[in-house]
Regions:
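Bacterial N-terminal signal peptides that target proteins for export
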Residues: 1-7
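Bacterial N-terminal signal peptides
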Residues: 7-17
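Boundary at the C-terminal end of the N-terminal hydrophobic targeting segment
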Residues: 18-20, 27
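Histidine-rich, glycine-flanked metal-binding segment
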Residues: 30-31, 37-39, 43, 52, ...
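Metal-associated gating/positioning segment near the N- to mid-region
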Residues: 96-164, 188, 199, 251-257, ...
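Active-site gating loops and adjacent loop-to-helix segments of metal-dependent hydrolytic enzymes
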Residues: 110-128, 171, 179, 183-188, ...
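Divalent metal-dependent hydrolysis catalytic cores, especially in the metallo-beta-lactamase
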Residues: 134-155, 174-180, 210-222, 240-242, ...
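Active-site core of metal-dependent hydrolases
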Residues: 218-290
Length: 290
């Protein structure tokens, strides 16, 4: 997706999400520095002769007409659809239209290992620099109109970026900001708070929920007791919690009430016969931050 089409992409994302809050501020309210990204302002627009992929699994609708009125798609019909007066017509013959992509596992940082040596070895701690300027643009340019940060190393930066995007002063997708990684003792990453007790886990979730985080992610070295406290506090506030886990097995996390698990079986430790309670297995928990 060309970044200059982000206003249209936002409209498609709004349609896919129903009648919730707009992804972006209306074009007329965007900061002047962002106006050059818009090739087609919002208004009454008819997209004709498009192939529509609606994301439901249904076959694509060929030669379709899409009617857009302001921030909402009002109709998706066949080629014979009547186009109301005063609609701007854009011919999309040969092009495909689909709802904005909802990214379920995204980050606003890029991993770097400044202390790596010539043989590829590195010493703790790792440093993870934030990409507050380029990451939102790159996501949007590739069609991601809604993203979940799924673990943050600089949660205030993520929350402030979300605020700038929502107010129309910065380019980027709608953001579900996950709080800081809920990591236990022994983290590789210097930017992570290391939780020391169930009460610490509860207080961490409560604090960041009050700051504006809307979901949470447990990380590799958290204990079962700490994870349970974090889950209970998140659920008390009607938020969900996921995990990139190795100290806690998947069955243990499911029993504790976790809502989601990231990365599949390559970080799952339940089948390791040498697995110790609340500890990552040998060779597991290698820092990937993916």
């Amino acid at each position: 997706m060309n970044l200059r089409l982000f206003a249209a992409a936002a409209a498609l994302s709004i349609a896919s999400r129903g009648s919730g809050a707009p992804v972006l501020a209306p074009a007329a309210q965007l900061a002047s520095a962002l106006q050059h990204f818009i090739s087609v302002p919002t208004g009454r627009i008819a997209l004709t002769h498009a192939r529509v992929i609606d994301g439901t699994g249904a076959a694509p609708l060929e030669d379709a007409t899409i009617l857009i009125d302001g921030p909402k798609i009002t109709a998706v019909e066949g080629a014979s659809a009547a186009i109301p007066p005063a609609y701007r017509i854009i011919d999309l013959k040969g092009a495909s239209v689909l709802p904005g992509i909802v990214g379920m596992h995204n980050h606003m940082f890029y991993i770097a290992r400044p202390n790596i040596d010539a043989s590829g070895h590195f010493e703790d701690p790792l440093v993870v620099p934030q990409m507050t300027f380029s990451a939102p643009r790159l996501y949007l340019a590739n069609g991601v109109t809604t993203m979940r940060t799924t673990g943050s190393v600089e949660p205030y930066a993520d929350l402030n970026v979300k605020s700038e995007i929502d107010s129309g002063t910065m380019v980027g997708p709608h953001m579900d900001v996950t709080g800081p990684y809920l990591e236990g003792s022994g983290s590789y990453f210097i930017q992570m708070h290391q939780i020391t007790s169930p009460d610490d886990a509860r207080r961490t979730v409560a604090f960041w929920a009050d700051q504006g985080a809307t979901s949470f992610k447990a990380y590799m070295n958290i204990t079962r007791a700490e994870l349970k406290a974090a889950i209970d506090e998140a659920h008390r506030r009607h938020f969900k919690i996921t995990g990139h886990l190795c100290s806690v097995t998947y069955p243990e996390a499911a029993e504790l009430g976790i809502d989601d698990l990231e990365h599949g079986f390559f970080v799952n430790t339940q089948l390791d016969p040498g697995k110790q309670p609340d500890k990552c297995s040998e060779g597991q928990g290698i820092p990937t931050l993916v």
